[in-house]
Amino acid sequence: MGGWSSKPRKGMGTNLAVPNPLGFFPDHQLDPAFKANSDNPDWDLNPHKDNWPDANKVGVGAFGPGFTPPHGGLLGWSPQAQGLLTTVPAAPPPASTSRQSGRQPTPLSPPLRDTHPQAMQWNSTTFHQTLQDPRVRALYFPAGGSSSGTVSPAQNTVSAISSTLSKTGDPVPNMENISSGLLGPLLVLQAGFFLLTKILTIPQSLDSWWTSLNFLGQTPVCLGQNSQSQISSHSLTCCPPICPGYRWMCLRRFIIFLCILLLCLIFLLVLLDCQGMLPVCPLIPGSSTTSTGPCKTCTTPAQGTSMFPSCCCTKPTDGNCTCIPIPSSWAFAKFLWEWASVRFSWLSLLVPFVQWFVGLSPTVWLSVIWMMWFWGPSLCNILSPFMPLLPIFFCLWVYI
C-alpha cells in the first residue's frame, strides 16, 4: 500500500466510489480537497499519502473505547483528549533576583521614536500626500464637492493635528480653581435657603408677638378649643382648619405680610432717594402750579448723562417762570418734610432742636448707648423676628 502497484487493492477504502471525506477508515487518504491536484487524482495510490499509523491503535479515545479518529481526536492530540489521565507538574516560579518587596515604581516609558518609529515617519507631508489620492479625497469631498487638486481644509486640519501632536501633554486642570468655582454657588444656595426658612418664620413670630399682647403675663391659648367642637389643646398661632380661630390667624398673617411688604418698599424708596434716583420737585413757597412747558432750558439733564431733569420750573399766573434745582440726594425726603411743614407748622420748631442734638455727637452716642442698655432686652425680643430682613436690606444697599 506504500507505493504504486498494479495488484488489486485490498482492504477498506479500496472502493473509490464510496465517499470518505473525513478519513475515518484505515488505509485511506483524506478528502482530496486538502491536497487535491490534477496530477494525482488516485489518492489511494498516492506515494506521499499518510498511512495513519495511529488509526490502527485500539484504545480509549474521544469517541469511546476501541475507536480513535485518525490524526488525533476532535479534542486534539493531548493525553486528556485521548482519554488518558496524566498529571502535569506545575512549573516552579522563577527565582527572584530582587531582594526588595512591595510595589516598585513604574519605570519611565521610552520615547515614541523608539517604541513606534513608524509613527514618526507619518508626518504632515505624508498625510497631505495621502489625501491627494482620489479614493481618500472622495471620503472628504463627496459628489458635488470640490474637485480641485489641493484640499484646503486638509491643510488646516493637518496643522491643527500637528500642533496637537507636538505637545507633550495637556496641563492638569487646577482642582483648586474648580472647587472654588463650585463652592461659591453652593454657599450662595445654602445662604439663600437659610434666609428663606428664616423669612418664612417671620409671620409666625410676629403672630406670636401680636397674640401675646392680649395675654400679658399669661400663655396664649386659643379660645376656639372651648367650643362644642372636639379640638385638642393648641397654640393660638397654630390653629387647625376646623378651629374657629383659624380665620383670625389667617387674617393676622395676611396683615403681617402686608406690613413686611410695606417695610421693604419703604426701605427701597429711602435707598433710591438717598442715591438721587427720585427727581422730585421741591415745593416752592407761593407757587400754585408746576410746569415744564415754557421753561425747557431749565430742565436739561444733569451733567448731560442723566435721564432725570436737574431742576424744576414753576409757572405762576402772571406768566413768569421760576426754576429751582432738584437736590442731588434726598429729594423725596425734603419734599415730604416741606409738605409736612406746610400742613403742620409746629414741625418747624423742631428743626433747631434736631440740629443741636445732632451737633452734639458725644451726647448723641451716650444717649444711644444708654437707651440700648435700658431697652436692649425688650428691643431684641421685639425686633428679633425682623433680623432675617437685615441681610436683604444690606444686599439692596450694596447692589443698587
Swiss-Prot record:
One of its GO terms (cellular component) is membrane. Residues 2-181, 275-348, 399-400 are virion surface. Keywords: Acetylation, Caveolin-mediated endocytosis of virus by host, Fusion of virus membrane with host endosomal membrane, Fusion of virus membrane with host membrane, Glycoprotein, Host-virus interaction, Lipoprotein, Membrane, Myristate, Transmembrane, Transmembrane helix, Viral attachment to host cell, Viral envelope protein, Viral penetration into host cytoplasm, Virion, Virus endocytosis by host, Virus entry into host cell. One of its GO terms (biological process) is fusion of virus membrane with host endosome membrane. Isoform M is N-terminally acetylated by host at a ratio of 90%, and N-glycosylated by host at the pre-S2 region. Interacts (via its myristoylated pre-S1 region) with the host SLC10A1/NTCP; this interaction is essential for viral entry. This is Large envelope protein. The gene is S.
